[in-house]
Each structure stands twice: as structure tokens, then as C-alpha cells.
Curated annotation (Swiss-Prot):
Heme binds at residues 316, 456. It is found in: Endoplasmic reticulum membrane; Microsome membrane. The keyword Disulfide bond does not apply. Involved in the metabolism of insect hormones and in the breakdown of synthetic insecticides. PANTHER family: CYTOCHROME P450 4D1-RELATED, CYTOCHROME P450 FAMILY 4. Belongs to the cytochrome P450 family. InterPro entries: Cyt_P450, Cyt_P450_CS, Cyt_P450_E_grp-I, Cyt_P450_sf, Cytochrome_P450_Monoox. One of its GO terms (cellular component) is endoplasmic reticulum membrane. This is Cytochrome P450 4d1. One of its GO terms (molecular function) is iron ion binding. It is a peripheral membrane protein. Its cofactor is heme. It is an enzyme of class 1 (oxidoreductase).
Length: 512
């Protein structure tokens, strides 16, 4: 009996290995035409990444593309997993410009325990329906109301910066921690309509849970040792993730239930109008309110549906904005002439009274600040790598891409290609001035918010928040970089772009 069972299991194992071998051999044969670095058995190119410090990943991707790619296309094997890196805007347009490649790459699975099937990771009909529902949340009338929240968060940020200015003086301090708490405050209030006061209570359970889950996501997505669920679930990191997820999900769920009950009591549970004249006009609405008053196929969204999207909004609008702001202040601190122009524009538009709120209309008049933000996002895109999964064999501009391939597109690499941007390592905000520049920009060469149908739905929100915080900081302080400005920061391209070492700044109060 046991011999029979053993024979059956051995046969099944043999058949499974044979099928896997044939599938793997097919991949190798189909992609044999594409250039790539020399490979090792079993690990492929994994030895270039396993056990190496995170900042080496950026160098390695640039090195591979510059050394081995042909027409800006390159294959990279991570074990049996085939990845194709693309750096040609024409190829990028095919991948991002249609819904043919709508599925995110496998690395995004690490987000599912927190975001479930929120807009970032959902696909197909569910993604299309949710996108349609969420779009009105970024209508200009609602964005106008969010500026009040940005103003409040900026005031708390200035208070903390002043404390550090007095405490550290010329030695400087890291702006990132305060900026990160500021964006957490603003995103939480705009998403859920509640204040968590992260800037005054950084040790709260919710704030710590957000920090924990961000750390977990970085490690899971870019450490091959945490990629496999069976082994990952046995690690202390998995236990920390579970604890943090319980805090985050319970907090969001509680707010959803409370707000749904409030709307019922107010008699306002009808579907909100999407008409331009009505959206956001009646009351200050949080992102949560839009979802609570929305329907899919004439049915209201469940609490789980809403939690997925609120958590996604929290995730997408928190660390990304912090990263953009940190690199913005680095750029203008190391380019005093640009900082001077930003300050003069802000003072000209907003006036000399530092207590004057910076309104939506005023923010839209900050044209040079806008150019500096765009140039910062070219050099330091908050999301340095985008991924798509190929579900069936296809051709992209004559190149055969087999089913099962992960396509990698790096906004960071695209933004530093000399063929696309003159002097790509130089901070030149004027290159984005469509009135004065002769430089013609391929729309798929500059993709800090991705591009196409799955572009970042909140990019106008993000730009508005960045400019609001910048305007408030620069009219109060002159920002100087503490360090060697001749050496660019060493970058770590994880889920969100960051630096190997914290960027340190000192600030001087502006008197006028």
C-alpha cells in the first residue's frame, strides 16, 4: 500500500517538475533574442541583488541598462522569474498607455494584506468601476476644500521646525520625520475626516502602525528572502505586520461605521451628485464621504469595499508626498538662486503677511514653484519602479514578450537618460516651462505619476499639497543643506525613493 502511494507521489512530482521544466524552457527559448547580463544556474541574476545593500539596486539597474540593453530593452532573471526592463518611451507608451497590460507585477502582492483589492492593486471590471467612483473625489471644488487641511498641517509642521531650529541651530536636523508626520496628518483628515494629530502625538498606536507597515512593505517587496509566504509567515516581521494590520484595519473600520451612522442621522445617505455645480459645494467632504454615498450597479459599497479604498488613499498619499517634499527642499537648498525665485514668487502672490492662508487660487498662481516640483519629480520620482504582469504572449513594437513576464519601468531611469533630457543630472526647472523652452518632451519619458489609464488618480491632490507646504515653509524660513552639496545623495530605490543617509537641513527665519 505504502509503495503504491509512494509511487503515485513520485510520479506526480516527476510530472510536475517536467511541466515546470518545459514551461521554463519555453520562456528561455522565446526570450533568447533579448540581451541581458550573463546568468548563473538557478539564481539567474539574483546574485547581483541577494545580500547586497539596497542602494546597490539603483546602480545595478542603471549599469545593466547602459551596458547590456539593446534599444533600451533588457532581460533580468531572478531565479525562474523573467523580468524585462524597458527604458524607451515608445515601449513605455504601449505598456502604460492601454489597459492591455492592466495587471500589476507580482511584487504588488505584498500590498494586498493591507489594501486588499483597492484601486492600486485591483484589476478588470472592479478596477474600472472603482476608478469611476473615485474620480469625483478629486474634483477642483473638493480639492479647494482640502487646502484648509494642508494649511493646518503646515502650521503644525512650522511649529516643529521652529523647535528643532532653536534646539539644533547650525548643526541642522532631518526634515523628513516632521514632513512625514505632516503628510500623515493631512492624508488622514482628507481621507477620513478625522484628525490623528500625528505631529503632536508621534507615538500613538495608529502612527506607529503606519510606520511599521511601511517598513514591512519595503522589506517584503525588495528582499527575496521575504517573497515566499510559507517562509515569511514564520518570521518576526510577519508577526509585526499582523499586529500593525489589526490596528490599521480596526481604526479605519471604526471611522467608516461612525461616519455611515452620522450620514444616516443627517438624512444624507443618497448618492452624491457628480455634477460640476454640486460636487463638494454643500459641505466639506472627506474622501470617505464620497465612497459612503456612492453605488456600484445600484448597490452601496460595503464597509470592506470602502476600507480598501480609504487604506489605499492613505498608502498612496503619505510616503510618496513625503519623499517628493524632502527632495524638493534638498534641490532648492543646494540651488539658492532657485529658492530665491520661489520665495519671491510666493511673497508676490500671497503677500507680506505670513499669517495669510494660502488659498487654492493662490497656489495655482505659483508657476515657478510648480516648475521646481516637476523638475524634482523628474530627478527623484517618489515611486522609482513600476511593474506590469504579461498574461499572454504579446508583441511590443516588434519585441516578443512571453506570458508570465514581469515588465519593469523605472521613472527614475527615464528621468536621467541624456537622450531624453539635456544635462539630466542638473536641476533645471525651466525645462518644464512650455512657454520658454524649446525642449520637446515625450509624455512617456516623464512619468512620476505613472501614465495612461492607470496613472495616479490623486496627482492633482499631491501637487496641491506639495505646493501648499512649500509655500508655507519658504515664506517663514530660508532652507540650507547641511553637507557636501557637490556629491549627490546616494539613492535607495525601494517601494518609495529615499536616501541611504538622512538629508540634514538648517533653517533661518525670514524677516520682512
Amino acid at each position: 500500500m505504502f509503495l503504491v502511494i509512494g509511487a503515485i507521489l513520485a510520479s506526480a512530482l516527476f510530472v510536475g517538475l517536467l511541466l515546470y521544466h518545459l514551461k521554463f524552457k519555453r520562456l528561455i527559448d522565446l526570450i533568447s533574442y533579448m540581451p541581458g547580463p550573463p546568468v548563473l544556474p538557478l539564481v539567474g541574476h539574483g546574485h547581483h541583488f541577494i545580500g547586497k545593500p539596497p542602494h546597490e539596486m539603483v546602480k545595478k539597474i542603471f549599469e545593466f541598462m547602459e551596458t547590456y540593453s539593446k534599444d533600451q530593452v533588457l532581460k533580468v532573471w531572478l531565479g525562474p522569474e523573467l523580468n524585462v526592463l524597458m527604458g524607451n518611451p515608445k515601449d513605455v507608451e504601449v505598456v502604460l498607455g492601454t489597459l492591455r497590460f492592466n495587471d500589476k507585477a507580482g511584487e504588488y502582492k505584498a500590498l494586498e494584506p493591507w489594501l486588499k483589492e483597492g484601486l492600486l492593486v485591483s484589476r478588470g471590471r472592479k478596477w474600472h468601476k472603482r476608478r469611476k467612483i473615485i474620480t469625483p473625489a478629486f474634483h477642483f471644488k473638493i480639492l479647494d476644500q482640502f487646502v484648509e487641511v494642508f494649511e493646518k498641517g503646515s502650521r503644525d509642521l512650522l511649529r516643529n521646525m521652529e523647535q528643532d531650529r532653536l534646539k539644533h541651530g547650525e548643526s541642522g536636523f532631518s526634515l523628513y520625520d516632521w514632513i512625514n508626520l505632516c503628510t500623515m496628518d493631512t492624508i488622514c483628515e482628507t481621507a477620513m475626516g478625522v484628525s490623528i494629530n500625528a505631529q503632536s502625538n508621534a507615538d500613538s498606536e495608529y502612527v506607529q502602525a503606519v510606520k511599521t507597515i511601511s517598513m514591512v512593505l519595503h522589506k517584503r517587496m525588495f528582499n527575496i528572502l521575504y517573497r515566499f509566504d510559507l517562509t515569511y509567515m514564520l518570521t518576526p516581521l510577519a508577526r509585526a505586520e499582523k499586529k500593525a494590520l489589526n490596528v490599521l484595519h480596526q481604526f479605519t473600520e471604526k471611522i467608516i461605521v461612525q461616519r455611515r451612522e452620522e450620514l444616516i442621522r443627517e438624512g444624507s445617505s443618497q448618492e452624491s451628485s457628480n455634477d460640476d455645480a454640486d460636487v463638494g459645494a454643500k459641505r466639506k467632504m472627506a474622501f470617505l464621504d464620497i465612497l459612503l454615498q456612492s453605488t456600484v450597479d445600484e448597490r452601496p459599497l460595503s464597509n470592506l469595499d470602502i476600507r480598501e479604498e480609504v487604506d489605499t488613499f492613505m498608502f498612496e498619499g503619505h510616503d510618496t508626498t513625503s519623499s517628493a517634499l524632502m527632495f524638493f527642499f534638498y534641490n532648492i537648498a543646494t540651488h539658492p538662486e532657485a529658492q530665491k525665485k520661489c520665495f519671491e514668487e510666493i511673497r508676490s502672490v500671497v503677500g507680506n503677511d505670513k499669517s495669510t492662508p494660502v488659498s487654492y487660487e493662490l497656489l495655482n498662481q505659483l508657476h515657478y514653484v510648480d516648475l521646481c516640483v516637476k523638475e524634482t519629480l523628474r530627478m527623484y520620482p517618489s515611486v522609482p519602479l513600476l511593474g506590469r504582469k504579461v498574461l499572454e504572449d504579446c508583441e511590443i513594437n516588434g519585441k516578443l514578450i512571453p506570458a508570465g513576464t514581469n515588465i519593469g519601468i523605472s521613472p527614475l531611469y527615464l528621468g536621467r537618460r541624456e537622450e531624453l533630457f539635456s544635462e539630466p543630472n542638473s536641476f533645471k526647472p525651466e525645462r518644464f516651462d512650455v512657454v520658454t523652452t524649446a525642449e520637446k518632451l515625450n509624455p512617456y519619458a516623464y512619468i512620476p505619476f505613472s501614465a495612461g489609464p492607470r496613472n495616479c488618480i490623486g496627482q492633482k491632490f499631491a501637487m496641491l499639497e506639495i505646493k501648499a507646504i512649500v509655500a508655507n515653509v519658504l515664506r517663514h524660513y530660508e532652507v540650507d543643506f547641511v553637507g557636501d552639496s557637490s556629491e549627490p545623495p546616494v539613492l535607495i530605490a525601494e517601494l518609495i525613493l529615499r536616501t541611504k543617509e538622512p538629508l540634514m537641513f538648517k533653517v533661518r527665519e525670514r524677516v520682512y
